Regions:
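Sec-dependent signal peptide recognition
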Residues: 2-10
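Primary mode marks residue(s) on the alpha4-beta5-alpha5 output face of response regulator receiver
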Residues: 21-177
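Hydrophobic h-region of N-terminal signal peptides that target proteins for export
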Residues: 11-19
Length: 177
């Protein structure tokens, strides 16, 4: 079992209001989760599914170090280092000093760009919805020179959660929804 994924899912599940275990078949879940990554990554990625009880099931073993999953309705595919970043975020710990890549080629439903722990849109939390994108985690991402604006154009690269320990690069690869 991969504890970081469990923690991440357990934080997101109540927000999503979705009982994933009963929602879709494993075959459909695998197809949907893999849609987060480019075909070359998806073909060898692991797929995990977290049940209503928080237990993680590996639906498909991988060979390339990427793990794909669905959190709420957001599909993502993470390398090992991005999972370490997510683990740190969920545990309110300092993020690792490693570069990590996460694909979200299906886009997202939105997040606060000022508060990593916000659970929904408010008048002052700079909610942003980004279309298909990838994320780059770790200190080197801060050297890319992307805007750190709280309300950036989601069609251009920007730094999410700028000024927090969890700052990372958001790199759109398609139009925002």
């Amino acid at each position: 079992m991969c504890r970081p994924l469990q923690l991440l899912f357990l934080m997101v599940l109540p927000l999503a209001g979705i009982a994933q275990e009963a929602q879709i078949s494993d075959a459909k879940y695998i197809d949907d989760a893999l849609s987060a990554a480019p075909a070359a990554i998806a073909k060898d990625a692991a797929v995990v599914r977290i049940g209503n009880d928080g237990a993680m099931r590996t639906l498909r073993k991988g060979t390339n170090g990427f793990t794909c999953l669905i959190m709420g309705t957001d599909k993502m595919c993470n390398d090992k280092n991005s999972m370490a970043f997510v683990h740190a975020l969920m545990n309110h710990e300092p993020p690792p000093n490693k570069v990590g890549i996460s694909y979200m080629l299906a886009g997202d439903k939105g997040a606060s760009n000022s508060d990593p722990y916000a659970t929904g849109k408010t008048a002052d939390n700079h909610w942003i919805v980004t279309g298909p994108h990838l994320m780059v985690f770790g200190p080197p991402s801060k050297t890319l020179g992307y805007t750190k604006a709280k309300d950036p154009d989601p069609n251009k690269p920007y730094m999410m959660w700028a000024g927090t320990p969890y700052e990372h690069a958001m790199i759109p690869v398609g139009p925002a929804r």
